[in-house]
A protein has these predicted regions:
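Periplasmic solute-binding protein
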Residues: 1-27, 53-86, 171-177
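Extracytoplasmic/periplasmic substrate-recognition and gating elements
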Residues: 22-23, 112, 150-177
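Short helix-initiation/N-cap motifs at beta->coil->alpha
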Residues: 31-36, 117-132
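Pocket-flanking alpha-helical
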Residues: 1-3, 13-14, 35-50, 59-61, ...
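Beta->alpha turn/N-cap motifs
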Residues: 52, 124, 141-146, 174
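A local structural motif
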Residues: 22-27, 107-122, 135, 152-155
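Paired acidic/hydrophobic, glycine-rich loop segments that form the ligand-binding mouth/hinge
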Residues: 137-142, 157
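Glycine-centered hinge/linker elements that transmit conformational signals in sensory
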Residues: 38-40, 81-119
């Protein structure tokens, strides 16, 4: 099962569409254009992308969002099922099938978004403050953030994770194995 009809909070990229229009930068449609947008914003002194990495769940969701294609393969599903099964008493570590590629993609994402050690201290309030003040064009967040900023008069939209293989993924809470 890849999809179930339930209510969920979608997690992906909250985007200040107004900044994109103001600087003539196209909205990303794939990973390459996401990286190009980040670079274009940095050239004008605006952070292209950031996230509240002080929280471990943000790091995990980013890793999962970038690797959704692998995590939905047979090997990925087998690993996730064993890892998350509360009845499983065997220790389940990271395998050598799914995870090497996942960490390679995360390393590339860190480079492409120019993540630094200072970013690891960003809280939700820090990140949304940067976004609200036009200091960041995109941040990792939930679909609820779009409405919050739209209510404040900021032209905001929501984009998925762009996989380097061309696929697009949105993380949801709750999630299903």
């Amino acid at each position: 099962v890849n999809w179930l009809p339930v209510c969920a909070d979608a997690h992906g990229f909250v985007v200040n569409r107004g900044l994109f229009e103001q600087y003539g930068i196209p909205l990303p449609t794939d990973y390459e254009s996401f990286v190009s947008a980040c670079q274009a914003f940095e050239e004008v002194g605006i952070r292209g992308f950031t996230a509240d990495y002080t929280y471990d769940y943000t790091c995990m969701e980013t890793l999962q969002g970038l690797s959704a294609a692998e995590l939905t393969t047979t090997a990925g599903r087998k690993w996730r099922t064993a890892y998350s099964d509360p009845a499983n008493t065997a220790r389940v570590g990271l395998d050598d099938t799914v995870w090497p590629g996942a960490f390679e993609r995360m390393a590339q994402f860190i480079q492409d978004t120019h993540l630094t050690a200072d970013d690891l201290a960003h809280t939700y309030d820090d990140v949304t403050g940067m976004f609200r003040n036009g200091e960041a064009a995109m941040y990792f967040g939930s679909s609820a953030g779009v409405k919050v900023f739209q209510d404040e008069g900021i032209d905001t939209t929501f984009l998925p994770f762009f996989s380097q293989n061309g696929e697009k993924w949105i993380m949801t809470t709750p999630y299903f194995q």
